[in-house]
């Protein structure tokens, strides 16, 4: 163990202790008309000391840890692309689909509701993966398109009485139009500049929704958003005003509140399957190759006769459309939307799904969405530290496996040893 490693471990632990002591170790209390700084509860200091010890030993043992896991991040840990191109992959995908359809009938109502939220984040992750993972454009304000889709459904239902299935394509079109309009001012921007512009866009959308109280309801939001129906049959005890009939009354079965949750899950699953189908078809088209060319080298992309302007516009437009679909599903699940549901934390969470899973890989996005959403639901007691945990997880991933859990594999051709020697000769 080198003295430099010990010194770095002590320095990192000291920095963590100071920062955690400031943010977690003190609290403000109201004493009459003034605020008084007081020490926090003992349980917080216990966690601070535990975190300090973890940081110290992690920094101390990191060189040995990196050597030990070097073989884990090798090629054998990279799974092949799962796109249904082979018979085995088709059978595997069919088995997953059957399990996903049968699963809500075997678990509790709460588990199905969490799975529905997971499906929403899968759609968001797949959409953001188009512009970040495939096109190489860093977007930090994806929550703005998400909010546009949700509020499109809420406003059309509130003012015009339109249902879920009518608003679903309209919300996608409105969000796609917003992505198309945003694409024009960012055509010449790259990297950090593009990220700042998109971050500003997401905040502008949220603030407009927050301040426009006459139309959007401001901070109070919009409530009483209906759930999707099955050919006009509502999954409720009684029909809404102007409704046709209920599912239980039409089929003569006993009313079960779980039917509404299960049907919403199946709708979300259908949208996920359609999203995967559309994206995989696009990747096999020249447009998908153009996205990858733009990500690898924009100058080379121009030299091949491709227009980066059109490629960026299509990426922004298609990505925003998926966010609109997810926003509609989110509004239907919640039955209520407000600007506080679309903060920067949502955009960061979706970006973490894409980065941690592996940029460019659809299967990796699904895996990361399941892991992160389920983990967040299980750690509801630590909700105030969710962004801290998410940031720490991303730091660890960038150190251990910067390419993501399951990075996208690219087609490769390898010459046999005999052919290689013949070419060298």
Swiss-Prot record:
Family matches, as Pfam families: BPD_transp_2, DUF3382
GO BP: any one term: amino acid transport
First-listed, main subcellular location of the protein, grouped into a coarse class: membrane
Keywords: Amino-acid transport, Cell inner membrane, Cell membrane, Membrane, Transmembrane, Transmembrane helix, Transport
Keyword Transmembrane: yes
Transmembrane residue ranges: 6-26, 45-65, 92-112, 120-140, 145-165, 167-187, 191-211, 260-280, 311-331, 353-373, 388-408
InterPro entries: ABC_transp_permease (IPR001851), LivHM_N (IPR021807), LivM-like (IPR043428)
A GO term for molecular function: branched-chain amino acid transmembrane transporter activity
Single GO cellular component term: plasma membrane
Protein function: Part of the binding-protein-dependent transport system for branched-chain amino acids. Probably responsible for the translocation of the substrates across the membrane.
Family of the protein in this entry: Belongs to the binding-protein-dependent transport system permease family. LivHM subfamily.
Descriptive protein name: High-affinity branched-chain amino acid transport system permease protein LivM
Source organism of the structure: Salmonella typhimurium (strain LT2 / SGSC1412 / ATCC 700720)
Name of the encoding gene: livM
């Amino acid at each position: 163990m080198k003295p430099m490693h010990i010194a770095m471990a002590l320095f990192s632990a000291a920095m963590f202790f100071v920062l955690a002591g400031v943010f977690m170790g003190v609290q403000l209390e109201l004493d009459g008309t003034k605020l008084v700084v007081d020490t926090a509860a003992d349980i917080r200091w216990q966690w601070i000391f535990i975190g300090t010890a973890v940081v110290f030993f992690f920094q101390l043992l990191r060189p040995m840890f990196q050597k030990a896991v070097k073989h884990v991040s090798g090629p054998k840990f990279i799974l092949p692309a799962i796109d249904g191109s082979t018979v085995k992959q088709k059978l595997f995908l069919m088995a997953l689909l059957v399990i996903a359809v049968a699963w809500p009938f075997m678990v509790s109502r709460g588990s199905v509701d969490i799975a529905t939220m997971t499906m929403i984040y899968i759609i968001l992750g797949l959409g953001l993966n188009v512009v970040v993972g495939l096109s190489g454009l860093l977007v930090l304000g994806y929550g703005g398109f998400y909010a546009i889709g949700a509020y499109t459904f809420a406003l059309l239902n509130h003012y015009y009485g339109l249902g879920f299935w009518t608003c679903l394509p309209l919300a996608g079109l409105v969000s796609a139009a917003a992505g198309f309009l945003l694409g024009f001012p960012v055509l010449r921007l790259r990297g950090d500049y593009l990220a700042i512009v998109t971050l500003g866009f997401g905040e502008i959308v949220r603030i407009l929704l927050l301040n426009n109280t006459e139309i959007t309801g401001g901070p109070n939001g919009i409530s009483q958003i209906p759930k999707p129906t099955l050919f006009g049959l509502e999954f409720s005890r009684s029909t809404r005003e102007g409704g046709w009939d209920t599912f239980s009354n039409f089929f003569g079965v006993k009313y079960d509140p779980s039917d509404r949750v299960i049907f919403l899950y199946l709708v979300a699953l259908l949208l996920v399957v359609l999203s995967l189908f559309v994206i995989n078809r696009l990747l096999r088209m020249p447009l998908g190759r153009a996205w990858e060319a733009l990500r690898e080298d924009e100058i080379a992309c121009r030299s091949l006769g491709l227009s980066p302007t059109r490629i960026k516009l299509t990426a922004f437009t298609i990505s925003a459309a998926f966010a609109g679909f997810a926003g509609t599903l989110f509004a239907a699940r919640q039955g209520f939307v407000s600007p506080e549901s679309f903060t920067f934390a949502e955009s960061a969470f979706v970006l973490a799904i894409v980065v941690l899973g592996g940029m460019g890989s659809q299967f990796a996005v699904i895996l990361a969405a399941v892991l992160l959403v389920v983990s967040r639901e299980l750690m509801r007691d630590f909700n105030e530290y969710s962004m801290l945990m998410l940031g720490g997880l991303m730091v660890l991933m960038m150190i251990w496996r910067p390419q993501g859990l399951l990075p996208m594999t690219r087609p490769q051709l390898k010459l046999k040893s005999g052919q290689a020697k013949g070419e060298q000769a």
